[in-house]
Swiss-Prot record:
Subcellular location: Cell inner membrane
GO molecular function: ATP binding; ATP hydrolysis activity; transmembrane transporter activity
Presence of keyword Membrane: yes
Membrane topology qualifier: Peripheral membrane protein
Annotated organism of origin: Salmonella choleraesuis (strain SC-B67)
Protein name: Putative 2-aminoethylphosphonate import ATP-binding protein PhnT
The entry's keywords: ATP-binding, Cell inner membrane, Cell membrane, Membrane, Nucleotide-binding, Transport
Length: 369
């Protein structure tokens, strides 16, 4: 795969810079494609924006980059209002899929391109190029041309070119989507390592791949129909999604009908009628009422209790799907289908078996319909 990098032409400022979006709104020909959105990305933080096609995630990134003019609101990078500044004055770099490295330039010259555009001294250019190639593990390929590299190697060169200019902010727009699965997996690990080595770099990462987001991001924002419908720390958002769309888009989830009965003695937990049983579940909202939903991740269910406080559903096994290291079970729980994922199950239960499905109260989340 070939990548295009857009880099600043002015020296990046010292220190770290976060991003603040203040009621940012974007419209094309009068049609609103991004509803007023407020979001803060802390300095040195990796924020992943995920969502289906057309949700507005790439529009946010392009607005931050300066390629889309907002219809309202402000964009701040550090303490600077960049809303109306051209891209080259924003102190950022951007890696986008499906655009070529310069085919007539060697790897080292591709990486040096932004620095030369900045008219940096030759000694500084050589130092930055050497360091950037070392950071992405491409030092041995400095004299090669793009056509002599694999897709993953070309991508590393594109990222090296971006970080060589020492941007305040790095924007990544689905940079792994065109790579094969194994290369993509390796590059996710490489990007995680890159941020460990450059902890001062603020990264806005747009992807449709939830695994990339979960692996790389400190925080995740979930977009739908031009709105930010969920935002939070990665683990907390996965563990306790605020709504059905977030729970199902960020990983697989069982969604069951439920009735909230009232608070328990434990903070944050409520009694819930669900699946033919009264259980305890996490809730951040109303503690009473009908028309609630219960969210449980398939991997949070087990065939044995994990503690004295474990919840239990009685279930009938409908199907078994063995997939090597994992076994997927589909069960009937009070007329609703529940999926569970198990490891190292021996012996395997049989279709029609009566099972007890156990889960911890904090792994069950009460959400609104």
């Amino acid at each position: 795969m070939l990548m295009k990098t857009t880099a600043v032409h002015a020296p990046a400022s010292q220190g770290t810079s976060g991003i603040v979006l203040d009621s940012l709104r974007v419209a094309y020909h009068g049609n609103v494609v991004l509803k007023p959105l407020s979001l803060t990305i802390e300095p040195g933080e990796v924020l992943a924006l995920i969502g289906p096609s057309g949700s507005g995630k790439t529009t946010v990134l392009r607005a931050v980059a300066g390629f889309v003019q907002p219809a309202g609101g402000r964009i701040l990078i550090g303490d600077t209002d960049v809303t109306h500044l051209p891209p080259y004055k924003r102190g950022l770099a951007m890696v986008v899929q499906n655009y070529a490295l310069f085919p007539h330039l060697k790897v080292e010259d591709n990486v040096a391109f932004g620095l030369r555009a900045q008219k940096q001294p030759k000694a500084l250019i050589n130092e930055r190029v050497t360091q950037a190639l070392k950071t992405v593990g491409m030092s041995d390929y400095a004299a090669r041309y793009p056509h002599q590299l694999s897709g993953g190697q070309q991508q590393r060169v594109a990222i090296a070119r971006a970080i060589a200019v020492r941007p305040r902010v790095l924007l990544l727009d689905e940079p792994l989507s065109a790579l094969d699965a194994q290369i993509r997996h390796n590059m996710v690990e490489e990007l995680a390592r890159l941020h460990r080595e450059l902890p001062e770099l603020t990264i806005l990462y747009v992807t449709h791949d939830q695994t990339e987001a979960l692996t790389l991001a400190d925080k995740i924002g979930i977009m739908k129909d031009g709105s930010l419908i969920a935002h939070g720390e990665t683990r907390a958002l996965y563990q306790h999604p605020p709504n059905r769309f977030a729970s199902e888009f960020l990983g697989r989830a069982n969604i069951l009908s439920a009735i909230a009965l009232g608070i328990t003695e434990a903070p944050g937990l409520v009694h819930v009628s669900c699946g033919g049983a009264v259980i305890r579940a996490f809730s951040r909202g109303s503690h009473h009422g009908y028309n609630k939903l219960l969210c449980i991740r398939p991997q949070h269910l087990s065939l044995t209790p994990r503690s004295a406080y474990s919840n239990r559903f009685n279930a009938t096994l409908q199907s078994v799907h063995w997939q090597g290291d994992l076994t997927h079970l589909l069960c009937d729980v009070a007329g609703e289908t529940v999926r569970m994922v198990l490891t190292h199950v021996n012996p395997l239960p049989r279709v029609g078996d009566k099972l007890a499905l156990w889960f911890e109260p904090d792994d069950a989340v009460l959400i609104e319909v």
